[in-house]
Amino acid sequence: MVSKLTSLQQELLSALLSSGVTKEVLVQALEELLPSPNFGVKLETLPLSPGSGAEPDTKPVFHTLTNGHAKGRLSGDEGSEDGDDYDTPPILKELQALNTEEAAEQRAEVDRMLSEDPWRAAKMIKGYMQQHNIPQREVVDVTGLNQSHLSQHLNKGTPMKTQKRAALYTWYVRKQREILRQFNQTVQSSGNMTDKSSQDQLLFLFPEFSQQSHGPGQSDDACSEPTNKKMRRNRFKWGPASQQILYQAYDRQKNPSKEEREALVEECNRAECLQRGVSPSKAHGLGSNLVTEVRVYNWFANRRKEEAFRQKLAMDAYSSNQTHSLNPLLSHGSPHHQPSSSPPNKLSGVRYSQQGNNEITSSSTISHHGNSAMVTSQSVLQQVSPASLDPGHNLLSPDGKMISVSGGGLPPVSTLTNIHSLSHHNPQQSQNLIMTPLSGVMAIAQSLNTSQAQSVPVINSVAGSLAALQPVQFSQQLHSPHQQPLMQQSPGSHMAQQPFMAAVTQLQNSHMYAHKQEPPQYSHTSRFPSAMVVTDTSSISTLTNMSSSKQCPLQAW
């Protein structure tokens, strides 16, 4: 007779025989173990199974479990040898109590799976659970297995004791038959429906009580224990096929109408049926996984809430980053960043506006150490009409904010007056200077026409609060070696003997826009800060003529 044992079982028997155990001793040991009630499964006559022993015509289920249990211990299964740490699950007790033909078929199927590779069986069960969206919690509730151990066994092939695998395989076999009956429910006519199909209908309507119906001859004690614990209803879980359909619909319409939701219900149920390998006409067999219009509505509502929450988080993060980036500028002052609350005489840069898109920003910093002064120019003037400047306002940008640029405070007025006359003019020229707002240029020019040049510097401020400052004589050149006086940048100028006008000419040549033929228009004068003009008395007439024709860009400090 050809042996029905697997190669591993044959190796185990060979190892037992080679260890000195005789056939008679082995058979006697098996007979002593068979009546043991430890596993709660009685001896029953079953068809020949792969785990059969020496007697091929009569094979009890318990003998199969015993052989598998021994094999599990040798392969490193967890738990004690006698299985006292794991009570017999109700599902095995039900299998013991059933005497129907269906129960015999289930036991035979469990025996076949126990004789196969555990990892192969685990992958098959995992794939079936994913196909039908069955959660592991349902398996845990029915079999009593530890969910962590079950997850490791299904995902990584962690060894599991044979008794536990028998409970898992029993659940798998029964679940297959249960789902098959659900999809075939409407095939049977209501007139010819038998008692068994009536019980199946009850199980379909109440899937949380998915316990196998008991035979008529079964005692009440056998079925009392499984019904004591109420099974939890399976929570609805969206399948991957339905989620793909819903996300595509969400991209098209975030709040679909009722008709659109009903169309999505049909499409999702069809996809779920195709995923399970059944006809879409049997969508009722999905049971707790049946997609309804209410579930589709809730899904879209949850997606909209999630999207709104993510947008709020993004806005909060952006606002927080903006606040953190502004805090160092507002709370920490530095020599290169003056606070906006500084008085006008501490500001070292002025920004003006000009009509058109072409804009040039200007800032000029002057720092002085001890008795020496050094000019550091960064650049860059916009064209400003003298008539556009109003002496009645502070140094403001067009948007009404104080401008803070790199550099220290302004040097004394006498220092400003001598910037353009260093080492090129005698001290007599530097004393015939006038410092006045732009609005007072015309008035001073008219007064100069009727009187001789003033020999004392004149300082005309906005509020009249500036005290007269005596001019300071500079006996040494204040420019740094890498900087040249502005006068040297305009060779051949007819105003070479007038230092300030030479600087004005240079700025006019470098910053006037050639393509601007018409006179530029400027913003309201109230938006521009007050500016002081420093020049000598001999040049005031020329400056007046240039300002009246709006062709002179003026430099402000």
From Swiss-Prot:
HNF-p1 domain location: 1-32
Q: List the disulfide bonds.
A: none
Where is this protein chiefly located? nucleus
The GO biological-process annotations, alphabetized, read as: anterior/posterior pattern specification; branching morphogenesis of an epithelial tube; embryonic digestive tract morphogenesis; endocrine pancreas development; endodermal cell fate specification; epithelial cell proliferation; gene expression; genitalia development
What are the residue boundaries of the POU-specific atypical domain, all occurrences included? 93-188
Q: Subcellular localization, per the record?
A: Nucleus
- Phosphoserine: modified positions: 49, 52, 75, 80
Q: Where is the composition biased (Low complexity)?
A: 328-344
DNA-binding feature ranges: 231-311
Keywords of the record, alphabetical order, are:
Activator, Diabetes mellitus, Disease variant, DNA-binding, Homeobox, Nucleus, Phosphoprotein, Transcription, Transcription regulation
Q: Which domain of life is it from?
A: Eukaryota
Give GO terms: molecular function aspect only.
DNA binding; DNA-binding transcription factor activity; DNA-binding transcription factor activity, RNA polymerase II-specific; identical protein binding; promoter-specific chromatin binding; protein homodimerization activity; RNA polymerase II cis-regulatory region sequence-specific DNA binding; transcription coregulator binding
A GO cellular component annotation here is: intracellular membrane-bounded organelle
Q: Which residues cross the membrane?
A: none
Map out region (Dimerization) in residue numbers. 1-31
Which stretches does the entry tag as region Disordered? 64-85, 324-352
**Pfam families in UniProt:** HNF-1_N (PF04814), HNF-1B_C (PF04812)
The protein's job, in short, is:
Transcription factor that binds to the inverted palindrome 5'-GTTAATNATTAAC-3'. Binds to the FPC element in the cAMP regulatory unit of the PLAU gene. Transcriptional activity is increased by coactivator PCBD1.
Subunit: Binds DNA as a dimer. Can form homodimer or heterodimer with HNF1-alpha. Interacts (via HNF-p1 domain) with PCBD1; the interaction increases its transactivation activity.
Q: Which family is this protein grouped under? A: Belongs to the HNF1 homeobox family.
**Disease linkage:** Renal cysts and diabetes syndrome: An autosomal dominant disorder comprising non-diabetic renal disease resulting from abnormal renal development, and diabetes, which in some cases occurs earlier than age 25 years and is thus consistent with a diagnosis of maturity-onset diabetes of the young (MODY5). The renal disease is highly variable and includes renal cysts, glomerular tufts, aberrant nephrogenesis, primitive tubules, irregular collecting systems, oligomeganephronia, enlarged renal pelves, abnormal calyces, small kidney, single kidney, horseshoe kidney, and hyperuricemic nephropathy. Type 2 diabetes mellitus: A multifactorial disorder of glucose homeostasis caused by a lack of sensitivity to insulin. Affected individuals usually have an obese body habitus and manifestations of a metabolic syndrome characterized by diabetes, insulin resistance, hypertension and hypertriglyceridemia. The disease results in long-term complications that affect the eyes, kidneys, nerves, and blood vessels.
Protein known as: Hepatocyte nuclear factor 1-beta
